[in-house]
């Protein structure tokens, strides 16, 4: 009996027992043959050079009538030979000490690694295990730490994930200060150690420009040169030698330095004005309105200013105000708000309702119209509300397609009817014209052939000629003879 296998894997004793049993081999020979396998199992499966031999898990296989074993061995499904590990993947924090181009390693092989710069210097190894995988290299290399950063003056440092190699920190300044320098730093390799790639920034006051001066007045503060975030200045109007007021201070008397972007300082508002007594500055701006009165820098007592709202807006309050003492306008200024000008029809059959249409629209607003399925839009799909309450262009209509088809059918029917009448009239006129021509020919024949002694004969001949469909030569000769 011959036992063969295309695989290089060792034969299992169970397979051999079945094979030799079927071949009629004596029991003594069979036991002698199986003895090496049994001893090998007792020795723990040690192979040559002290490497551990890897055995595949048992698989059910049968010897079929074709004298072949059913089922493929597990090693046939491996991308590498049994008892080996594939080359390990590249480690992110370490490199191999001895470089090799081997693509696989026997079980029990160990490889030496050393940690990369930026990590605490050390060596370690990974080993090919019995299951053809490598021991873990995780946490073998520990990242070095940069020195603990300190808060900048008038600022803060923000540590998010730590201060180890590769970490990033951020700096911010307190309110009223701006950052000079880099707002972040990264722990990087420097020579044989690690350190932050940039120095800590500086936080300085946000500066403001000198406050603007005003006619007939001045500002007062703790300094006249350096102004920074949070400082306050106060304005006053000039007085006479006795301290009597000559002007009225109009506006906010105090301004403070602030910032909109955290970089550049600005004053909180415009400076006040010092105006003559019993005068008024122009009234404040009224949104969506125009001032009809003459625009002047100053108004006298009891001067009147009138307002008018823009088209499409409705005024609330008095349309005119009067200048009063201490730069006050009375009554209260009016306001202009959008008025409901245009409305959609209550009956909107055939229109789509999901387009955000409203029942009422303000001046200048647009409405978009679309028809539902089965309807046709007649007119523009968009209309705008006008100041007089009308729509421009006029609102479109949604007409049912069945009605449109009926209208088209009626129109075509009318055209066909007119054409039929025209053809009928044409045929009648043509027929009358032909009859008129025949009568003329008959009259000419009578005049040519008229004779007193042959009236009866000629009349009979003409009647006979009309009733006949063809004219014979004999009849022509007879007519000539009579004439």
From Swiss-Prot:
Ubiquitously expressed (at protein level). Gene3D superfamilies: Complement Module, domain 1. Keywords: Complement pathway, Developmental protein, Disulfide bond, Glycoprotein, Immunity, Innate immunity, Membrane, Phosphoprotein, Pregnancy, Receptor, Repeat, Signal, Sushi, Transmembrane, Transmembrane helix. GO terms for cellular component: basolateral plasma membrane; cell surface; external side of plasma membrane; receptor complex. Its main location: membrane. It is a single-pass type I membrane protein. Residues 41-405 are extracellular. Disulfide bonds join 85-128, 115-141, 146-187, 173-203, 208-257, 237-274, 280-323, 309-336, 342-385, 371-398. Residues 1-40 form the signal peptide. Residues 427-483 are cytoplasmic. The keyword Protease does not apply. GO terms for biological process: cellular response to hypoxia; complement activation; complement activation, classical pathway; female pregnancy; in utero embryonic development; innate immune response; negative regulation of complement activation; regulation of complement activation. It comes from the Eukaryota. Glycans are attached at residues 98, 366. The chain crosses the membrane at residues 406-426. Disruption phenotype: Death between 9.5 and 13.5 dpc from developmental arrest. Acts as a cofactor for complement factor I, a serine protease which protects autologous cells against complement-mediated injury by cleaving C3b and C4b deposited on host tissue. Also acts as a decay-accelerating factor, preventing the formation of C4b2a and C3bBb, the amplification convertases of the complement cascade. Plays a crucial role in early embryonic development by maintaining fetomaternal tolerance. Also acts as a costimulatory factor for T-cells which favors IL-4 secretion. This is Complement component receptor 1-like protein. It comes from Mus musculus. The lineage of its organism: Eukaryota, Metazoa, Chordata, Craniata, Vertebrata. The gene is Cr1l.
